[in-house]
Amino acid sequence: MKLSLLSTFAAVIIGALALPQGPGGGGSVTCPGGQSTSNSQCCVWFDVLDDLQTNFYQGSKCESPVRKILRIVFHDAIGFSPALTAAGQFGGGGADGSIIAHSNIELAFPANGGLTDTVEALRAVGINHGVSFGDLIQFATAVGMSNCPGSPRLEFLTGRSNSSQPSPPSLIPGPGNTVTAILDRMGDAGFSPDEVVDLLAAHSLASQEGLNSAIFRSPLDSTPQVFDTQFYIETLLKGTTQPGPSLGFAEELSPFPGEFRMRSDALLARDSRTACRWQSMTSSNEVMGQRYRAAMAKMSVLGFDRNALTDCSDVIPSAVSNNAAPVIPGGLTVDDIEVSCPSEPFPEIATASGPLPSLAPAP
């Protein structure tokens, strides 16, 4: 059940603009636990919310489980290829939870290394509450991001079937891919180059574990527990430092000690097809959040008809606001930015005081 690209885009924009009220604050149905919501089908998600925040997120923390779910939500949904379908092959079910349902197959994909414990923990939550794995992945992502200051409240739609097939292999773009390979793969799934850049806002909260084990959990920007534009700014800084004893897989020099730079991020930040969109994400946390929310809403319904799903966004908590302005890190200036957008000047961004940062591993 697939919508046309035009109708999908229109629906996503409408959904992105219709911001929900807050957890249990936007509807006329009273759940058994006393919460208020827009639809009785949403009531079960309050129980899942409590379970996730207490156990999975270890007290509503913005730490490693959030980073793992951000990998899982992308790796699950991007297993979707209309090109394979057109060639008469199974093209994947999109955001169907197959990474959990068929973990014996999908966790063997190289891109899914290090996700086994998280996938199995999610499986237990889904079974305990009787919810589909596809719905659970989307819900856990929205809840996890709500624990990180500055994050937008993501849309959450429920009603995905728990029936799925294993994703075809080799559909997950990786840090060692070329820009062309990444854009082609994402384009096959329906995403423009601009939307690829928008989705990479998730790297604002990211760290790496398997690309260079010597610097385990090294963050991709200086604020890995805050959803902000520092990732886009810092990826444009000149690479001058090797943060570990040697460079890892798909690793580039970084701007200061402790920060990990993925080759794919560095290339996308400087490629003519994506550089201007990248630069436009550096100066406004609000714009970044709006664009990420819209792109995630689109990704969350890959393989599904959003009109057949139920909007339970009002169950999702709101993140604490982030009022900090974007900055060029201390010890550096705008001259250290590798400006790559020829059509627009680099935005005016203040420089932080103090010395060059040295980052600790992300929690």
Swiss-Prot record:
Name recorded for this polypeptide: Peroxidase
GO cellular component term of the entry, any: extracellular region
GO biological process: cellular response to oxidative stress; hydrogen peroxide catabolic process; response to reactive oxygen species
Residues engaged in binding Ca(2+) 2: S204, D221, T223, V226, D228
Glycan-bearing residues: N162, S358
Note accompanying the cofactor annotation: Binds 2 calcium ions per subunit. Binds 1 heme b (iron(II)-protoporphyrin IX) group per subunit.
Native species: Coprinopsis cinerea (Inky cap fungus)
Site positions (Transition state stabilizer): R71
Gene: CIP1
Binding site for Ca(2+) 1: D76, G94, D96, S98
Family: Belongs to the peroxidase family. Ligninase subfamily.
Cofactors required: Ca(2+); heme b
